[in-house]
């Protein structure tokens, strides 16, 4: 399928670009999300990339040029997508859900709203400061949140002072914008 070819080509562009510009694991650029959508007569290709240190606009622009060149130099992709496609390469930005486990590292110290399942399978919502992230091999990856009271309620109980959550039990995590 041509869309699979496009996706694997974009993944390869991100990987090769990352190898060229990265100075270590923290600056390694990774693909967060990729969406291909029909937009009238054209196609919109949205590529979200990030690194543990964050990504700058000049890197997004350079990666966008590389992806566009890849599409335009591939006869099969050119035939399907033609010259009428919109390509957007950017970082995920604040306020959206975390989609890649390595994004947690970048957001250490920030406030997160998390929906997670406990050992019994019950769903809980908590807002807290991301204190620690452990993605090391040899054990299940986890994070540690320090819950904060949200809203104006004075009563009500907070969860324990720190919550350790396995990443596979997190249904959704969103970085909260603080002022």
Curated annotation (Swiss-Prot):
Family (UniProt): Belongs to the RimP family.
Keywords associated with the record: Cytoplasm, Ribosome biogenesis
One of the GO biological process terms: translation
Descriptive protein name: Ribosome maturation factor RimP
Key word Cytoplasm present: yes
Stated role: Required for maturation of 30S ribosomal subunits.
PANTHER family referenced in this protein's UniProt entry, alphabetically: RIBOSOME MATURATION FACTOR RIMP
Cellular localization per UniProt: Cytoplasm
Record has Cytoplasm as a keyword: yes
Cellular component GO terms, alphabetical: cytosol
Segments crossing the lipid bilayer: none
HAMAP family for the chain: RimP (MF_01077)
InterPro entries: Ribosome_maturation_RimP, RimP_N, RimP_N_sf
NCBIfam families: PRK14641.1
Tree of life domain: Bacteria
Species of origin: Prosthecochloris aestuarii (strain DSM 271 / SK 413)
Main location: cytoplasm
Cystine bridges: none
